[in-house]
Amino acid sequence: MAEQTEKAFLKQPKVFLSSKKSGKGKKPGKGGNRFWKSIGLGFKTPREAIEGTYIDKKCPFTGTVSIRGRIIAGTCHSAKMNRTIIVRRNYLHFVKKYQRYEKRHSNIPAHISPCFRVKEGDHVIIGQCRPLSKTVRFNVVKVIPAGSAAAGKKAFTAA
C-alpha cells in the first residue's frame, strides 16, 4: 500500500481495494492490484511506475493524465518544488539589425512523477498535457542523467 501521508486516504481510482477474495501472493506493487498504462509515443513505462507503491493522480503512467500536443527536451534547472521541476530551454534569437544571434532561454514548469529521480543538470523530455495547476502544463516522460550524456564523449586528460 502507498505511504499514507495526507489527510485523505490515498488510492488509485481504478483499483478496487475491498475485494472479498484473499489475494494470495498479490501484493500491491508486485503485479497485484496496481493500475499503470503505456503512454505511447515511443516512451517506455518506468519499472518504478509498475512495481512502485506511490499514488500520484497527475502521473502520466499511473494517473489520469494523457500526454498530447508538444514534446519538448530541456535541462532540469531547479528541482526544489514538491513534484515539480523547472525545465530550462536555451535557444538563439536572430537580431535582424545586427545580423547576429543572441542567446535566450525559457523556463517551463513541469510535473515530475515520483517514479523518476532527477537532479539539477539532468536532461529531461517533457510532454504537454492538460493544465495541472495555474502554471504547470507539462509532464516529465523521460529523464536522461547528466553523466550518461557525456559518457560517449572522451574527456580531455593531460598525460
From Swiss-Prot:
Keyword RNA-binding: yes
GO cellular component terms given for this protein: cytosolic small ribosomal subunit
Biological processes per GO annotation: translation
Highest taxon of the lineage: Eukaryota
Molecular functions per Gene Ontology: rRNA binding; structural constituent of ribosome
Stored CDD domains: Ribosomal_uS17 (cd00364)
Compartment list: Cytoplasm
PROSITE patterns tied to this protein: RIBOSOMAL_S17
Chief subcellular location: cytoplasm
Keywords tagged on the record: Cytoplasm, Ribonucleoprotein, Ribosomal protein, RNA-binding, rRNA-binding
Family membership: Belongs to the universal ribosomal protein uS17 family.
Cross-referenced NCBIfam families: PRK08572.1 (NF006345), uS17_arch (TIGR03630)
UniProt-recorded name of the protein: Small ribosomal subunit protein uS17
